[in-house]
From Swiss-Prot:
EC number, UniProt record: 2.3.1.-
Enzyme class per UniProt: transferase
Active-site annotation: H176, D383
Keywords linked to the UniProt accession: Acyltransferase, Transferase
Effect of deleting the gene: No visible phenotype under normal growth conditions, but mutant plants have significant reduction of ferulate in leaf cell wall.
The name this protein goes by in its record: Acyl transferase 7
Amino acid sequence: MAAAAPDKAVERLSQKLVHPSSPTPSAPLRLSWLDRYPTQMALIESLHVFKPDPARDAAGQGLAPARAIETALARALVEYYPLAGRLAVSRDSGELQVDCCGGAGGHGGVWFIEAAVPCRLEDVDYLEYPLAISKDELLPHPRPRPTRDEEDKLILLVQVTTFACGGFVVGFRFSHAVADGPGAAQFMGAVGELARGGERITVAPSWGRDAVPDPAGAMVGALPEPAGASRLEYLAIDISADYINHFKSQFAAATGGARCSAFEVLIAKAWQSRTRAAAFDPSTPINLSFAMNARPLLLPRGGAGFYGNCYYIMRVASTAGRVATASVTDVVRMIREGKKRLPSEFARWAAGEMAGVDPYQITSDYRTLLVSDWTRLGFAEVDYGWGPPGHVVPLTNLDYIATCILVKPWAHKPGARLITQCVTPDRVTAFHDAMVDIN
């Protein structure tokens, strides 16, 4: 008789609002222009998969995952107290701010949900795509469900789901209005530091929103529009270190020994492969957009401790014909030239000299590819006492915006993983074939 299929049902064990473990300030806090940008009004969702630690479990060391993380979360919120607050509109300025109401007795707090699954992580392929368990079962959704207005005010929600093997998944929903990627990872790292027994957080958080420019008359473009946009297909591709080194070597040979990054190589290859697969007319204008960290341009010590939004969207423009027929080395050159413009272009934007152009605008135009590098944010280094995550799963609810996310591969093997949603279903095979072709 065939073995019964493993039970993958998620049981919610508890939900609560976690408050800072000590008293915290209650005065409202101003958000920067970039924090208040319309597309930041979203909860960014991700799953972080942690393998079991048999030696730790056998020795009975420490708390179980949910208890360890909940306890550390309450301690971390003493210094990161704005994350326990709520987004609100200032009565004075009419602008979005943080109402620091997360202290005990306040109406804030971080939603924390504990759940369990009776199967092992390996029974669900460690949550490789396609997910064997619905993402919404692993992400924190309080019950009863908040109204849209209530959810729009939330800043942070956490769920820890433990599996029968001792492994666990941490699901985060984090307001982009309060933290960008490096900022969110910084906070998660602080929770991990305390969960591992640390007495205090090594890098003290800094609010510091006044350092971020608020340009007079800064343009805010239209929001991405799903109407009329194509549905784009998900595809994850694991890339070997040999693959990356092959193209790095080509670049070095063509440039007299110059070096380029894995990000530059992989994004160049992805942009070219997508352009070829999409079969654009050669004269079609196409764009590559990617966020660059602006902390070194604005903040002392490179912005250590700052966790608000501090980035700039760089754009590389070309034609489909040029990108499709160029060598990967030449596409890398285009990207590197775009990156060099960061200091001057950011300075122009900060001075209000962009002449009606919104550099932060995200578009659903199929001709634009939006790429993100998650390998340098810090998520892959977060450790709650069981070691760093086996892998991190970025989640997107917008299947009409062409995206490509670079993450670290499973269990930190050499190489990288590309998580893409950038071509229509009928073009996925062509895109995949172009990506794996190293000629």
